[in-house]
C-alpha cells in the first residue's frame, strides 16, 4: 500500500458506496440521503436514480453488472431491500429481495457483483453477515456469519483474480483482504479516512478507490501487485 490522493465531490451527501461505471467515464456512487449518482473523475455528480419522498433512499452500497449496465443497490433503515435499476433508462427500481437480518441502522450495507450471475451482500453488524444472492430472482444461495476479524461490513468487492473478497471496515478504519467466508488474510490501515464506507479495487490504475461518508471525498489509494 502506497500513498493516496483525494477527489472532492459536489452534489452528493452521505457517500456510502462506490464502484466504477462500466463505460469507464467515472464512478457510480451510493448516497444514504437520496439514492444513486454518477460522479466524474473530477468530482462532478449527476443523478442516476433517486427518490425524494421523505428523507429519500437510504442507499448504502452499489454495484454494476458490467455486461448489461444494470445497477444493483441495497437500502438500510426501514426497508432492508436489494434493488435493481435497469440500463439504459435507470428510470424505475424493482425490489429483488427483502432481507431482515439486522437491527435498525445496522442492516444491509454492502453489495458486489460476483460475475457468475450472483451478488454478494453484506449485513453491516449485529450480526456481520455475508449473503450470496441470485441476481435473477434474489433468492439466497448461501449465508455466512462472520464472528471474528471484521466488526463492521462497510463495503464489499469481489476480486475475481484472487477469488476473494475485500471488505471495508469503517469502525476499525481498515481494508481487509478475505477469503470468501470472510476470514481476514491481510489487513491495511486507512486511519486517514474518517468513515470509509465505499470500496472498489481497480487493477487498471493499480489502486483502491474509497469513499468517505463524512466528507463525501473519494480517495485513490495506490497499491502495487494488486
Please place each PLM-identified region on the residue numbering:
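Short loop/turn segments immediately following the C-termini of beta-strands
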Residues: 31-33, 76-78, 123-126, 170, ...
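Blade-level signature of beta-propeller repeat domains, shared across WD40, Kelch, NHL, RCC1
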Residues: 198-226
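Short loop/turn segments that connect beta-strands within beta-propeller blades
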Residues: 40-44, 85-90, 134-138, 179-183, ...
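Beta-rich, blade/repeat-based domains predominating
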Residues: 10-23, 54-67, 101-117, 148-162, ...
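A short beta-strand motif characteristic of beta-propeller blades
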Residues: 2-10, 45-53, 91-102, 139-148, ...
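Beta-propeller domains
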Residues: 28-50
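Structural signal for beta-propeller blades
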Residues: 35-37, 79-82, 127-130, 173-175, ...
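Conserved beta-propeller blade signature
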Residues: 26-30, 70-74, 118-122, 164-167, ...
Amino acid at each position: 500500500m502506497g500513498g493516496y490522493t483525494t477527489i472532492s465531490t459536489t452534489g452528493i451527501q452521505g457517500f456510502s458506496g462506490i464502484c466504477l461505471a462500466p463505460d469507464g467515464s467515472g464512478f457510480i456512487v451510493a448516497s444514504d440521503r437520496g439514492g444513486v449518482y454518477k460522479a466524474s473523475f473530477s468530482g462532478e455528480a449527476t443523478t442516476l436514480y433517486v427518490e425524494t419522498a421523505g428523507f429519500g433512499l437510504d442507499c448504502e452500497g452499489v454495484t454494476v453488472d458490467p455486461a448489461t449496465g444494470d445497477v444493483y443497490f441495497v437500502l438500510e433503515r426501514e426497508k432492508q431491500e436489494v434493488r435493481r435499476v435497469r440500463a439504459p433508462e435507470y428510470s424505475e427500481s424493482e425490489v429483488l429481495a427483502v432481507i431482515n437480518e439486522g437491527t435498525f441502522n445496522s442492516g444491509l450495507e454492502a453489495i458486489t457483483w460476483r460475475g457468475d450471475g450472483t451478488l454478494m451482500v453484506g449485513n453491516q453488524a449485529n450480526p456481520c453477515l455475508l449473503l450470496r444472492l441470485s441476481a435473477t430472482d434474489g433468492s439466497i444461495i448461501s449465508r455466512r456469519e462472520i464472528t471474528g476479524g471484521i466488526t463492521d461490513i462497510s463495503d464489499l468487492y469481489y476480486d475475481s483474480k484472487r477469488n476473494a473478497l475485500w471488505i471495508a471496515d469503517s469502525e476499525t478504519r481498515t481494508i481487509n483482504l478475505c477469503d470468501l467466508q470472510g476470514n481476514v488474510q491481510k489487513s491495511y490501515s486507512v486511519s486517514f479516512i474518517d468513515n470509509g464506507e465505499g470500496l472498489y479495487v481497480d487493477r487498471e490504475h493499480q489502486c483502491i478507490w474509497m469513499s468517505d461518508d463524512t466528507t463525501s471525498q473519494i480517495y485513490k489509494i495506490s497499491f502495487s501487485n494488486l
